UniProtKB/Swiss-Prot annotation:
GO cellular component, one term: cytosol
Binding positions for substrate per the UniProt entry: 118-121, 211, 244, 262-264, 274
An example Gene Ontology molecular-function term: fructose 1,6-bisphosphate 1-phosphatase activity
Source organism of this protein record: Vibrio parahaemolyticus serotype O3:K6 (strain RIMD 2210633)
Single GO biological process annotation from the record: fructose metabolic process
Reactions the enzyme catalyzes: beta-D-fructose 1,6-bisphosphate + H2O = beta-D-fructose 6-phosphate + phosphate
Coiled-coil residue windows: none
InterPro entries (UniProt xref): FBPase_C_dom, FBPase_class-1, FBPase_N, FBPtase, Fructose_bisphosphatase_AS
First and last residue of the signal peptide: none
Protein name (record): Fructose-1,6-bisphosphatase class 1
Keyword presence, Nucleus: no
PANTHER family: FRUCTOSE-1,6-BISPHOSPHATASE-RELATED, SEDOHEPTULOSE-1,7-BISPHOSPHATASE, CHLOROPLASTIC
NCBIfam families, alphabetized: PRK09293.1-1, PRK09293.1-3
Keywords for this protein: Carbohydrate metabolism, Cytoplasm, Hydrolase, Magnesium, Metal-binding
Amino acid sequence: MSGMRTLGEFIVEKQADFPHASGDLSSLLASIRLAAKIVNREINAAGLGDITGAVGTENVQGEAQQKLDVYANDKFKAALEARDQVCGVASEEEDEAVAFNKELNQNAKYVVLMDPLDGSSNIDVNVSVGTIFSIYRRVSPIGTPATEEDFLQPGHKQVAAGYVIYGSSTMLVYTTGNGVNGFTYDPSIGSFCLSHENMMIPEDGKIYSINEGNYIRFPQGVKKYIKYCQENVPEDGRPYTSRYIGSLVADFHRNLLKGGIYLYPSTQSHPQGKLRLLYECNPMAFLIEQAGGIASDGVNRIMDIKPTELHQRVPFFVGSKNMVRKVEEFLELHRDEE
């Protein structure tokens, strides 16, 4: 990877495009980069130490917390607090938003929402996992503690978002609203290097990603769409390929590169869907729109939804533009059949 730009160099270059930029966002992204390296090191050695498995506690959603969930949450929180650009964080692993109390943090203008380790239950079987993050400007007065209102903002107000995927190689993918860029971690120099510049998702794809084990519980429109994907229509490129890893970051990353759609609809047991709007769906929606795709709850643009609670859930359809539009058509056509 010699000759490639590192993430740090790239951020500085982009900052130079804005003469009045303070550098706070650049420093914040450096904090995320540092925490990602620390978590990556621990994940790579997960099978050698006592860091896999559950800790015996549940998060606010009632999900068993894995040891690495707690570890990643602690490391990202510590890194974000240390640089003084963040006044508070909200996390899947925290019941409530955390306001940083140091005076320097209270003078910061950003809040961060995150899923510190998406897909962590897959660690034990060596499946790719990831970190998802979303950054907003606070709405509360600078110089005061962060409030819940700082976090309950619609996705279109994000100033940056991204994810880290810990897989066969580790990548950090992010956007600040000017395209999507991916950086692969080079352990020989300890840096993320630009490997995927101006990432764009194809308008059409041949991959659909959904947990078909829940088929019987899906809305009728989703069932019909799955059957549509499976039909043998060679001139239309069907049947499509079914690929579902069970880690949002991993499924999203593959579809971003190759074209496809990820679906997590409402079900009988989860009528509001299962994925969280603020720190899973919104950041992925920002990324996919910047890459030329679409993110929807089946009716509405994800980033237009006004959140009412920190851990709010929504149905989620994200990926190639034409594929998301098609599933929306099926949902509308069969809406009265529920």
